[in-house]
Amino acid sequence: MMQQLLALVGALATLILTQHAEGTAPASPSPVEISVLRDCIAEAKLLVDTAYNHTQKSIMQRLRSGSASPMDLLAYFKQPVAATRRVVQAADYMHVALGLLEERLQPRGSRPFNATDVLTEPQLRLLSQASGCALQDQAERCSNKYRTITGRCNNKKHPWLGASNQALARWLPAEYEDHRSLPFGWTPGKRRNGFLLPLVRDVSNQIVRFPSKKLTSDRGRALMFMQWGQFIDHDLDFSPESPARVAFSMGVDCEKTCAQLPPCFPIKIPRNDPRIKNQRDCIPFFRSAPACPQNRNKVRNQINALTSFVDASMVYGSEVTLALRLRNRTNFLGLLATNQRFQDNGRALLPFDNLHEDPCLLTNRSARIPCFLAGDTRSSETPKLTALHTLFVREHNRLAAELRRLNPHWSGDKLYNEARKIVGAMVQIITYRDFLPLVLGRARIRRTLGPYRGYCSNVDPRVANVFTLAFRFGHTMLQPFMFRLDSQYRASAPNSHVPLSSVFFASWRIIHEGGIDPILRGLMATPAKLNRQDSMLVDELRDKLFQQVRRIGLDLAALNMQRSRDHGLPGYNAWRRFCGLSQPRNLAQLSRVLKNQDLARKFLRLYKTPDNIDIWVGAIAEPLLPGARVGPLLACLFENQFRRARDGDRFWWQKWGVFTKRQRKALRRISLSRIVCDNTGITTVSRDIFRANIYPQGFVSCSRIPKLNLSAWRGK
């Protein structure tokens, strides 16, 4: 019975992705009876729920048996949970119900049609309500004094703008094979702009790959610069993958068979691959979960599970249930919860997630250390990322304790909200004052992003779909090791240089190998990798990602390019046009844009036209702007996104009325260096923490780093 049901789901999923064919208009289907629509909705719910349950049981079984692959680990952290899962489930109900309806109504032998074109407005409302999509658009009164956890009511006119679990913004229309949902590269022989797309693994091999001897360290940026980029990215966006991670047809495990069946979109292996010799093998890949269709628009979009604001949601969460779990509910002091089993030299660590089958346990079975719990599910991805999460939980609790000393009459909720508000402002200041000028170049950011001029309710603050790929530029700055340094900034410990491929999901390294101080010193005193056109991504990420638990390590570059196709993102030239930049058409023009004829020739040998170059690889290949770590295209996209996140935020720290004048003056003195000083055993820090400094040059005593004076919060 289960096999038959899974087979039916597989056939249905394939049907849903059937594309609009080019040519004559479809024949008109019969009117839709309410009973037929209700039947389709009921059947869709059964199919979706069965697929979800089958997938969840399979992953749990592999985790329990210790046979989980890296894709299972990735799946665990990319799975939608709580409210996000309900939103994704609603979208799947609707997509599947529409697919069933099209199957029933389509005249035999006619071309496919769009079911939403023949449904009446009451029928569309019924479908939206029955699926759960309508619940996401409920009106509400906005009278909140503080930011909501979900980001709702930031914009009083449109309360859902920038809120969690909403569709990503589209700055350009999506481009799919079938104009609706099929990614380019799905159908063999299907052309894009007149040419076949190269395999993403082939692009990774020929453009991104480089010998380790060519690695160049960045003399101007520290590894902390790279790490803050990932931290802030996890504040802004997260597009979860489909909860159904096995091919439905006949219960096939597409990680074992490389079957291309929804939602599996495996990365194929080219001939003469330098590492994977079996061309019939693949790198598993699963599509991002869809968003609920908007109005009659059935073009696939993806959701952002996080708030779109720079609001420290990676510390506090983007869902109310998670935010409550993260708080210390044993007292009324406004504190965040911390670990009850372990400490870091007397200082707090993140609490454990307390899961029964924990993927972090697989990285060291004898250590028995589970994953940590934080505002973002990816906090245990690497110890470096965990270190920043830990740092800001400690800072919140430090602020809450100090605010209570100043205001003993404040309630626990007020202490929590005021400390959260300050931490949010800190993240905004560090990002816009210290980080972005080093990304974009100080001269350019003054000219393009400009000073803050106030809140504008007409600005759409939502994270753009393209930004979720473009901001992965930070992958090019990762060194192949995690560096840990002692109190004298020496690499004296036995595990001071750990290969990057050995630290993924290794929460045990925080507990049993010295805590976060050595990691933070390593981030401050080690230069980032410099992104160069002949050395883009280290092999620890390109060939060995999660290799410790799988026969084939994943390829992060290939995953990024496959994801851009999955999301229906337009190609390189479309984004150049969006930014008002030239659109190269031939070798000579692309050579001028890249200032590199050999690289341009490689691109055209693979893609045939610059129009088809995948946005991530095309953007990171551009020459860096003066004083920046990105080229013109990424600079344009980042400026656009970060301007929207600032000007469309009703709770921006500089907005009149959010903080008092005295409080704003006090906040201007904060720094990431000071946060390190206040919450660790480190006594000597980098003054300019994102710039490359080789100890002791550029390092000062914590006594010389300005402190935040909280007296402006007394009696507020």
Swiss-Prot record:
Residues 19-140 form a propeptide. The record marks R378 as: Transition state stabilizer. Transmembrane segments: none annotated. GO terms for biological process: defense response to nematode; eosinophil migration; hydrogen peroxide catabolic process; negative regulation of interleukin-10 production; negative regulation of interleukin-5 production; negative regulation of macrophage cytokine production; positive regulation of interleukin-4 production; response to oxidative stress. Ca(2+) binds at D235, T307, F309, D311, S313. Its cofactor is Ca(2+); heme b. It is found in: Cytoplasmic granule. InterPro entries: Haem_peroxidase_animal, Haem_peroxidase_sf, Haem_peroxidase_sf_animal. It catalyses: 2 a phenolic donor + H2O2 = 2 a phenolic radical donor + 2 H2O. The active site is at H234. One of its GO terms (molecular function) is lactoperoxidase activity. Residues 1-18 form the signal peptide. It is an enzyme of class 1 (oxidoreductase). Its main location: cytoplasm. PANTHER family: EOSINOPHIL PEROXIDASE, OXIDASE/PEROXIDASE. Belongs to the peroxidase family. XPO subfamily. Tetramer of two light chains and two heavy chains. Mediates tyrosine nitration of secondary granule proteins in mature resting eosinophils. This is Eosinophil peroxidase. It comes from Mus musculus. The gene is Epx.
